[in-house]
């Protein structure tokens, strides 16, 4: 799972508080992450942290590493993907746990932008599914011996929905 978001700073990486300190045989990481997708079930974690001089790196950490714990967050929606908190207390990792090319803010924002692109596609798929369900309902819901889909207002609402969805898909295609 991808551990960037924190309770205090949200998804603003420049306000991140999770830190690392270099020691002779690796790094010591301290901090916490919140609202991390799949944290309760992940086998490995990608954890972003900064040093005292504000150098940012991403570390690959095994779930069984001493000092690393996670807990599930109970959610009211999007339950298909679990979310959780990750706690890092004096987590010691070897020097080779730093992912290559993850030095600096450019790497952080590059990951965020790629994630946003994927999230946008997912949202468009969800919107299209909602439209299909609404259309099917309008075709099957009978009022006064006619489907409500025969009403001009319902047709307009469905057409407006599809127009907005098409614009969203176009935006995703242009962004990619």
Regions flagged by a language model, labelled:
Residues 23-25, 50-54, 63-66, 89-96:
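Short loop segments at secondary-structure junctions
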Residues 18-21:
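A structural signal for short hydrophobic beta-strand segments in well-ordered beta-sheet cores
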